[in-house]
């Protein structure tokens, strides 16, 4: 079960990713368990877990990083500052889980990626909206379906281990906090450069070139 107590608002060293990060993963977006959007209201892009064989020390848990989708099949139009750049893949922030999701007791390991809006956009998970009868609702960022599109992922840091939960609502709330922790962690200069570029750092630009090369 998830331990009681507040969560750290930021994770990872301020100086930037440390080994083994960044970790590269890629693959076509495939159908997952069908729960992300339907039950949880959290759209996820799943990619095949076979590539994890190249990273045997990568533990199960929740991570943050950046992603890009093949622009030949999917173009992101949610950032007005990118007008005229449709031929270039957009690099977007992401939070992801690698593991078995103890709440659902999955038998096979999966990679489930939730793509967030640009850091310049308002965060949809910053607060919980109150519905009728006092129930709270979380709105997560949603994109049109892009099954079959090639996705590239750079994992930049680790957030937390997997937990089981007493309720679906508790699981959703922890994922909401994961999104906020990921955003805050990526907003630091040493991480934001993987999204924005323009820092003149060869190591970062090399990773960015890999992300957008399809």
From Swiss-Prot:
One biological process term in Gene Ontology: FMN biosynthetic process
Keywords: ATP-binding, Flavoprotein, FMN, Kinase, Magnesium, Metal-binding, Nucleotide-binding, Transferase, Zinc
The keyword Zinc belongs to this UniProt entry's keyword annotation: yes
EC number: 2.7.1.26
Record's cofactor remark: Zinc or magnesium.
Pathway assignment: Cofactor biosynthesis; FMN biosynthesis; FMN from riboflavin (ATP route): step 1/1
Obligatory cofactor(s): Zn(2+); Mg(2+)
Active-site residues, record numbering mapped to chain: 112 (nucleophile)
GO MF annotations in UniProt: ATP binding; metal ion binding; riboflavin kinase activity
Catalyzed reactions: riboflavin + ATP = FMN + ADP + H(+)
Gene Ontology CC terms: mitochondrion
Binding of Mg(2+), residues: 44, 46
Region (Disordered): 1-26
Superkingdom of the organism of origin: Eukaryota
Xref: InterPro entries: Riboflavin_kinase, Riboflavin_kinase_bac/euk, Riboflavin_kinase_dom_sf
Family classification: Belongs to the flavokinase family.
Protein function: Catalyzes the phosphorylation of riboflavin (vitamin B2) to form flavin mononucleotide (FMN) coenzyme.
Name under which the protein is recorded: Riboflavin kinase
Organism per entry: Aspergillus clavatus (strain ATCC 1007 / CBS 513.65 / DSM 816 / NCTC 3887 / NRRL 1 / QM 1276 / 107)
